């Protein structure tokens, strides 16, 4: 019997990212069980949360709403079960791209210019103000679900309507076209940066999960001093939201080398296409060791 006791691996759930979560969770479960840990699958869509009583720890491999937005974290707090990843407030903030931006801007971090959209927005004015291309996003979804790249004038309203199908809170974000990068965080350490080069026009759901021609560069090609500066900044961005345990910070870089923080993922994917396992591997940590380390960092607020 391991020192972790009885471990629930939470995956599946009811969000739009259920399929990704099932993939992540099944791999996490196998990695834990392969190390002799008493780990069990737990799908909140199929089992009542009361059934978690008697578990000693929880590994959260849920993605999206009710999984990384503070909801399941609050339930685990009430049951006094230590869990992986960030606490209630940090999870809720990070899931909300709009409020993440408010926090980061107040702290002086660089972020892409953006606007909140409603059905009554002057879409032509916003296109003019932000310029094209821009990205329209549901503020509280992940995996690029509901996201549209707007390249032509007059297309913003339709993009808003698509995003609003997923979330009434919608943002339009100025496109930063120099490159997309991500920084995995484990404990107090920022992992090596990964540069993402999708074969598609941008890093959408298809490129993230279903294609094998997306390129992931690690080392990312940035000068060492620049990489260390950004890794330090990513830790700061994570901590400003109250992040703990592990996570992932995404950022964009423009053609002049200026970087802009984009969002935080507090329950990163653990699939065979996922980014934190890639960075950990470059850092000398294989998948089972990574999963065990994340579980070691489980805590309560």
UniProtKB/Swiss-Prot annotation:
- According to its UniProt record, in which pathway does this protein act? Cell wall biogenesis; peptidoglycan biosynthesis
What cofactor does this protein call for?
Answer: Mg(2+); Mn(2+)
Could you say which residues bind Mg(2+) 1 here?
250, 263
Keywords of the record, alphabetical order, are:
ATP-binding, Cell shape, Cell wall biogenesis/degradation, Cytoplasm, Ligase, Magnesium, Manganese, Metal-binding, Nucleotide-binding, Peptidoglycan synthesis
Which EC number applies?
Answer: 6.3.2.4
Q: Which Gene3D superfamilies match?
A: 3.40.50.20, ATP-grasp fold, A domain, ATP-grasp fold, B domain
GO function terms (MF aspect): ATP binding; D-alanine-D-alanine ligase activity; metal ion binding
Q: Where does Mg(2+) 2 bind?
A: 263, 265
Q: Which reaction does it catalyse?
A: 2 D-alanine + ATP = D-alanyl-D-alanine + ADP + phosphate + H(+)
Task: Give the chief site where it resides.
Answer: cytoplasm
Which GO biological process entries does UniProt record here? cell wall organization; peptidoglycan biosynthetic process; regulation of cell shape
Q: Could you give the cofactor binding note from the entry?
A: Binds 2 magnesium or manganese ions per subunit.
HAMAP family for the chain: Dala_Dala_lig
Q: What's the family?
A: Belongs to the D-alanine--D-alanine ligase family.
NCBIfam families found in the cross-reference section? D_ala_D_alaTIGR, PRK01372.1
The protein in question is named D-alanine--D-alanine ligase
| Lineage, broadest ranks | Bacteria, Pseudomonadati, Pseudomonadota, Betaproteobacteria, Rhodocyclales
Q: Which gene encodes it?
A: ddl
């Amino acid at each position: 019997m391991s020192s972790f006791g009885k471990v629930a691996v939470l995956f599946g759930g009811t969000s739009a990212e259920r399929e990704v979560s099932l993939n992540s969770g099944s791999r996490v479960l196998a990695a834990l069980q392969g190390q002799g840990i008493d780990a069990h699958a737990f799908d909140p869509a199929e089992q009542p949360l009361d059934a978690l009583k008697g578990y000693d720890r929880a590994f959260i491999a849920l993605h999206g709403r009710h999984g990384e937005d503070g909801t399941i974290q609050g339930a685990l707090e009430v049951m006094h079960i230590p869990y992986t990843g960030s606490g209630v407030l940090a999870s809720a903030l990070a899931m909300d791209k709009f409020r993440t931006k408010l926090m980061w801007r107040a702290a002086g971090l660089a972020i892409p210019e953006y606007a909140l959209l409603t059905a009554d927005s002057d879409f032509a004015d916003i296109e003019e103000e932000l310029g094209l291309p821009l990205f329209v996003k549901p503020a509280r979804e992940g995996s690029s679900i509901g996201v549209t790249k707007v390249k032509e004038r007059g297309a913003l309203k339709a993009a808003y309507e698509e995003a609003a199908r997923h979330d009434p809170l919608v943002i339009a974000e100025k496109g930063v076209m120099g490159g997309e990068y991500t920084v995995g965080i484990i404990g107090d350490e920022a992992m090596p940066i990964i540069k993402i080069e999708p074969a598609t026009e941008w890093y959408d759901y298809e490129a993230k999960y279903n294609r094998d021609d997306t390129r992931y560069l690690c080392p990312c090609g940035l000068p060492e001093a620049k990489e260390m500066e950004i890794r330090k900044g990513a830790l700061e961005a994570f901590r400003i939201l109250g992040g703990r345990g592990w996570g992932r910070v995404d950022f964009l870089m423009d053609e002049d080398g200026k970087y802009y923080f984009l969002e935080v993922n507090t329950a990163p994917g653990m699939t065979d296409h996922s980014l934190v396992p890639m960075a950990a591997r470059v850092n000398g940590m294989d998948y089972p060791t990574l999963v065990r380390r994340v579980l070691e960092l489980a805590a309560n607020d």
